[in-house]
Amino acid sequence: ILFVCLPNKYAPKATIMGLKNHLHVFCEKPPGKNVKDIEDVIKVEKINKKLKLKYGFNHRYHRSIEEAKKIIESGKFGEIINFRGVYGKSKIIPFTGEWRSKRRESGGGILLDQGIHMLDMILYFSNEFNQVHSFISNNFWHHDVEDNAYIIMKDKKGRVAMLHSTATEWRHKFRLEIILEKAQLELSGILSGSKSYGEEKLIITKRNMGNINTKLIEKSHKYTIDRSWKKEIDEFAEHIINDKPIINGNSKDALCVMKLIYMIYKSDKGWKKKFNL
């Protein structure tokens, strides 16, 4: 088994090398710098069909997200109407060599590095989006990658998602609202190593079907332990041992979210022209 935890520039090359050497591969997100990177990986994956390839979208394994997924799939509150999300931190954190803030190393900024999780969750709860409008900027930190992405998207069913991915959120924030026909799900805060995103909570607010003055019915669930990393790796191991197909974080998921990210980048004509996307 090979675990790939490298800068975006090297991740696809290492993944391909692992598959060619007959290793099961777990690669942290993002899968590369651009769409071509993951497409190149998939070509090699198809040749090595017995090997397992999984990408690290660990947010899917947080309990608040798992519970929200169950509620949506149950249909008890009807269909999804829209999404509203904010995921942000106070800077594009520089690790060794500050590669995350350099386009030639990373391929993108806060959207590709952190916003990818929010986009993956929205895709996890719904399906692919075919209309995208965006404003992308690097006006604050002045790196050659984005520090803010303002996005509105629509899918074929008419469901709309609004998202702000930012590296100018001075108080770190994770918040995703999912509006259903009969209720609203609010995912607020997320457990992380930095412990800077607040308590992880899922608040369920039922739609008021009667008098406008009737008190809203709310249920709040708080989660104090993050087992997402363990669940993710346990699932990967189970799929290897029992020769099961990868369900969460497979190469199709990685390709879908990378295509969406580049739709977002290219939707801003100025950004597209500036970086020849």
Q: Where would I find each of the regions flagged by the language model?
A:
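A short helix->loop->beta-strand "cap" motif at the edges of active sites that frequently abuts
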Residues: N21-L23, N48-K52, R159
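Beta-loop-alpha module in the N-terminal Rossmann-like domain of NAD(P)-dependent dehydrogenases
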Residues: I1-V44
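Predominantly a Rossmann-like dinucleotide-binding segment in NAD(P)-dependent oxidoreductases
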Residues: L51, H59-H142, W271
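Short, well-ordered coil/turn residues at beta-beta hairpins
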Residues: C5, F125, F135, H164-S165, ...
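NAD(P)-dinucleotide binding in Rossmann-like oxidoreductases
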Residues: H142-D144, K157-E232, I247
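Hydrophobic residues in well-ordered beta-strands that form the structural core
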Residues: V4, C27, L53-Y55, L187
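Short glycine/proline- and charge-enriched loop/turn segments
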Residues: H22, G97-E105, I212-K219
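C-terminal helix-rich "cap/oligomerization" subdomain common to oxidoreductases
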Residues: I1-V4, K46, K156, F236-L277
